[in-house]
Design a protein with these regions (language model features):
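An N-terminal structural lobe/cap that precedes and organizes the functional/catalytic core
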Residues: 2-105, 113
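Metal-centered catalytic cores of metalloenzymes
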Residues: 12-21, 26-35, 135-141, 149, ...
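Short, structured coil/loop segments at alpha-helix boundaries
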Residues: 37-38, 58-59, 76-77, 146-153, ...
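Short, surface-exposed linear patches
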Residues: 66-68, 141, 262-265
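Low-complexity, flexible helical/coil segments
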Residues: 70-71, 128-133, 276-282
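Short C-terminal domain-edge/linker segments immediately following a structured domain
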Residues: 75-76, 123-127, 271-275
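Long, hydrophobic, well-ordered secondary-structure blocks that form the structural core
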Residues: 105-164
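Charge-dense, low-complexity intrinsically disordered regions
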Residues: 157-329
């Protein structure tokens, strides 16, 4: 018998890349999340979760942006260039219902309640859609491996999706009743145009004073989420952080966020983005101007190494220096 050919690193990388591409492709979900299903137009579109013409056009360079999302053909590279037309898209709305976002697509931010709602609702929608796809993706992954980590990931996605379904009921009712004052929120404004934009959510476990808010290990309890949207406009930038009013465990948390200094606000937004999203776009010129040390610090933070190893955190860690500052790009 001949010797079995040893699989090269190149062959292994190619095989893993092919598996990753196949898993991503088979896990895609095309479904309009708007509650008025009977009004849906025929086609589900590739909707931008961050405004294309208004924000991505401002941040992009030569039609490209940087995102911390590996591409299917190279799942080992974290920060990657994406074309503006592909960046931040998800198949979560039909063409008709995507028009509901025109008040934030076509108008400058003016602190109006409906605008705040739409920014936060879109942040919710993309994350809920990703949890739907995440559950499906872990099912696909089981075809390639029996590693227990897949079961753990599937449980995490399933629980997050379950909790966000409860949030969806509240968002849906607000849309159906045309009643948008359902959020406790804070808006931070900055007197410069930042070179990034982001949306996402975070499930905080402790407040800024180190007090426990909720326990992620309690699988029976419904977790409360913070949703956020950060974006530049003409000569200014804004960050909206919100929780549903019926998530009373976060009421005091939102109140404490209103008392932060601007330095603490910046640290907190950096913290939210590190912990709460990959839906982040960065201006390529700003990214490539960073030193390799700064890029490594960003990637290290984004990989959440401390969380993986269960490293302890100090009281108020959310508003302390996060190791890098997106506002300085």
């Amino acid at each position: 018998m001949g010797k079995k050919k040893k699989q090269s690193k190149k062959d292994l990388k190619r095989r893993l890349s092919e598996q990753f591409q196949s898993t991503v492709r088979k896990s895609r979900i095309k479904e309009c999340l708007h509650p008025k299903k009977e009004e849906c137009s025929e086609n589900i579109i590739k909707a931008h979760s961050i405004q294309n013409n208004k924000i991505l056009s401002k941040i992009s360079k030569n039609g490209n942006v940087i995102m911390p999302i590996p591409k299917p053909d190279n799942p080992f590279q974290l920060t990657t260039e994406y074309g503006r037309k592909r960046a931040t898209v998800f198949t979560g709305f039909c063409g008709h219902h995507d028009q509901m976002f025109s008040p934030i697509e076509d108008c400058d931010f003016n602190y109006e309640i409906k605008q705040v709602f739409l920014y936060i609702y879109r942040a919710f929608a993309v994350e809920y859609h990703r949890k739907m796809e995440g559950v499906k993706q872990q099912e696909e992954m089981k075809k390639y491996t029996s590693d227990s980590i897949i079961d753990d990931l599937q449980l995490a996605f399933t629980l997050a999706k379950r909790d966000m379904e409860k949030d969806k009921e509240v968002f849906d009712a607000a849309i159906l009743n045309n009643e948008f004052n359902i959020l406790n929120y804070v808006v931070y404004d900055f007197d410069k145009e930042i070179k990034f934009a982001a949306t996402g959510f975070l499930t905080p476990t402790d407040d800024l004073q180190g007090n426990k808010i909720q326990n992620l290990s309690d699988f029976e309890a419904k977790m409360s989420n913070l949703y956020f949207s950060v974006f530049p406009e003409e000569n200014k930038s804004y960050a909206i952080v919100a929780a549903l009013k019926n998530d009373e465990s976060l009421t005091d948390y939102i109140t404490s966020l209103k008392r932060l200094t601007q330095e603490e606000q910046i640290n907190f937004i950096n913290h939210l983005i590190i912990k709460g999203t990959e839906n982040l776009v960065i201006n390529p010129n700003a990214w490539y101007a960073l030193t390799e040390e700064d890029k490594e610090s960003f990637n290290y933070s984004f990989a959440q190494i401390e969380d993986f190893f269960g490293m302890p955190t100090d009281k108020g860690y959310q508003i302390k220096n996060q190791g890098f500052d997106l506002f300085n790009l």
